Amino acid sequence: MDEYAWLAWTPEHLSKRLQHLARPWCVVGGWALDLWHGQQTREHSDLEFTVRREDFPLFRQTLSELKFYTVKNGAFECLPEHDLPGDDIFQVWGFDTEANAWRVDVMLEAGSAQSWVYKRDTSIVYPRAEMIALSASGIPYLRPAATLLFKAKNTRPKDQGDFTRALPNLSGEDRQWLVDHLQRLHPQHEWIADLTH
């Protein structure tokens, strides 16, 4: 598979397809920040969203026009129609054979209907309602502080750009949340100084 063959759906396209599925999900990554901004601030090569691991079969059924491939350490494996991703799989890409392109990147999370769990440190748990917001058009997205925490681990130029654009608009609460968790997980991160000055 060509990992660069992306023609990603927009969050609006995804939301329309999932509108009748009563299970928690939310857009993450760069698109989550743009949903928070209320406008697209940069190009996006993919569309990432999270679902609870146990709910993946329902999402797969709803997005039945796609073929799904597990992704681990840069390797892609076709996920047979009725198989579940292994416990060591946290990412599944959806491929549109008609368009010959990837459409979505599905992140499998460990949370419950009520709780959000940070996958890189499962001791970080919050009520899901506190971590997920809705765009003006009703699309669920991960709140900006948590999105930026994910981006802090291996900060690429686009992640730095996302942070720079987000910083002036972060609420005091989001700034403090991000500072607290950066100090815990990435205590030398340069964003801490930006957030506290």
Where are these regions (language model features)?
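Compositionally biased terminal segments of proteins
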Residues: M1-H197
